[in-house]
Amino acid sequence: MMEKHFVGSEIGQLRSVMLHRPNLSLKRLTPSNCQELLFDDVLSVERAGEEHDIFANTLRQQGIEVLLLTDLLTQTLDVADAKAWLLDTQISDYRLGPTFAADIRAWLADMPHRELARHLSGGLTYGEIPASIKNMVVDTHDINDFIMKPLPNHLFTRDTSCWIYNGVSINPMAKPARQRETNNLRAIYRWHPQFAGGDFIKYFGDEDINYDHATLEGGDVLVIGRGAVLIGMSERTTPQGVEFLAQALFKHRQAERVIAVELPKHRSCMHLDTVMTHIDIDTFSVYPEVVRPDVQCWTLTPDGRGGLKRTQESTLVHALEKALGIDQVRLITTGGDAFEAEREQWNDANNVLTLRPGVVVGYERNIWTNEKYDKAGITVLPIPGDELGRGRGGARCMSCPLERDGI
């Protein structure tokens, strides 16, 4: 049955969330391919799965519904149109050649849906297909070459789609290693019974077009509430993507302002939520680099003619105070000395998931920052992340809220 989905803030009571448990895609990571697949290291997949189970159970113990991406994708494949569309989009004639692609699609179409879902996220090698499928393409590849590359970054469900007030952006991803993720989410939101026919807006990203430089990823999008959205312009989210999303939000009267902040273009700051998260009404966790006075920041508002009015702000902090209607934003910076703070930011100390005002989930290893949270009255529900953290994503990165109260 279709349900109502609404995300009204970053800090209101979290009610439903989508996660992705580590699976086949991470088992495909090797030292020789991990950089191409946007990982810095290979993980112990079994241990990462155990850590992820603790994360999911921590949320369930707080009364939060946890939906798993593989389950949603499997159930979506039960819809014939969804399966046909996914096979057409994920197995391209132009990538494999028309005859080989047709043979692979036919073989995959007969596969049990859970196994097919496993390959749609985990990839498929030439060595896994039946010997009866013969083609020049097969003859010219090694058995360990990929027909479909794995999608290990599905672990970070925050990025591929993000719910903003009464709608969702299904994001055109910046890197080729992640672009096929979007098709899996497009299918889920179009055909899965929980979403099909739903009364929600699709702001951006659900068209069969080349979005070129207009890329957007959910780790850069913070729904700070009270009609405002904060978006980081990072190495993954561009000003072009921000403008398209802002125009859609204003067109559908879902936001009154979008704050756009320019982020340093380096790996440790790949998304806004790796350096900044909203954890209480007036409180943000930040790595100090993002709130320097020289960081450029703009507020976008409707111009009354379908376009955008742009106002440059003196500082990000000032823009946040105006948007939230508060006198002073409280900033909790990454803990420890300069060396410890850099290490903990790298290990996602600022990338916490707020469950309700003043209560967050974060990695237990970030002892200095967690101590600062505690002293500031923020409750941290700790989870292990020795393996999960190797992917450079914390609790916020690994979660896509589907329902959350406003403020």
UniProtKB/Swiss-Prot annotation:
Q: Which UniProt keywords apply?
A: Arginine metabolism, Cytoplasm, Hydrolase
Q: Report a single Gene Ontology molecular function.
A: arginine deiminase activity
**Location in the cell:** Cytoplasm
Assigned EC number: 3.5.3.6
Family annotation (InterPro entries) = Arg_deiminase (IPR003876)
Q: Which reaction does it catalyse?
A: L-arginine + H2O = L-citrulline + NH4(+)
List the Pfam families.
Answer: ADI
Q: What is its main location?
A: cytoplasm
Question: Which pathway does the record list?
Answer: Amino-acid degradation; L-arginine degradation via ADI pathway; carbamoyl phosphate from L-arginine: step 1/2
Q: Which GO terms describe its biological process?
A: arginine catabolic process to ornithine; arginine deiminase pathway
Gene Ontology CC: one annotated term: cytoplasm
Locate the active site: C397
Per its UniProt entry, which superkingdom is the organism in?
A: Bacteria
Task: State the top-level EC class.
Answer: hydrolase
Entries under NCBIfam families matching the protein: arcA (TIGR01078), PRK01388.1 (NF002381)
Which family does the similarity line name? Belongs to the arginine deiminase family.
Q: What is this protein called?
A: Arginine deiminase
Q: Which organism is it from?
A: Salmonella paratyphi C (strain RKS4594)
